[in-house]
Amino acid sequence: MTHSIPSTTRRTVLTTIAAGSLAVAGCTDSGSTDSPGGGDISRVDVDGIELVVEYDAETSATGLAVIAPSGEAFAERQLTPGASQETIPIGTAYPPGTYTVQLVDEQSVVAAVEQSLRPDVVIRDLKLARNHPEEMYEGAADFTITSEVIVTIENIGTGPEELTGLHFDGDIPRPTPDDLEESGIAAVNQPVTYTEPVINPGDTINVYSITFPFAPGGDVVSCTPEGTDGRFTVILIGNVAGELTEREYNVTYQGQDLTDCQISVKRAES
């Protein structure tokens, strides 16, 4: 599809089209867009933290542009004659939303499709390391195994996300401090340090706390022979989407004290 634009500058062409003067091929909430209605653009795919655009090598277009949800140009490339693919870095600080991928020449938009870039990170499972020591990372110390949590998360969205916070609140021995400046996620190759891992669309990963939420001690909860029940919340924070998700869990403490306590957790019903 070719739409002539009465403009003298290429950037004006891009922003005008982004504002809605061009009908584009359908937008998908999966990680990629096949583009039967996208003219010379055959496919747009999210590959990790990059956007891969495939197009007709014989296109008349001379450039490629990616327009952000705001209507501003997110990226621009000159096309190499005879090439059929361009890769655009997305990174982990992009504004989430619907982007428009365009093939352009000096005075017109040759083809365009929409692509969703929006992370959606969910908690799939949570385990106390003390109850599953075999699932902790190699080299974890005994106190770390006693105190930390393993969280399985999945990105069911269409864009990558950098995890910047893993917080715990509620009826646990050591809630996450409000003034914590680090992520609260352990770097497993250097477990005494924090990390901010990236999770790509479609990926499932385990992350490990490093704030000792279930360390023995503290006066927030007590462990009793008859059992003490409570509830706590797990919060994930991302660089792109902000607060991504929170999940509540029921917890029971049974034993003489927190240094000799059986702790069981179960996902709370919504």
Spell out what each predicted region is.
Residues 1-270:
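Terminal disorder- and signal-encoded targeting elements
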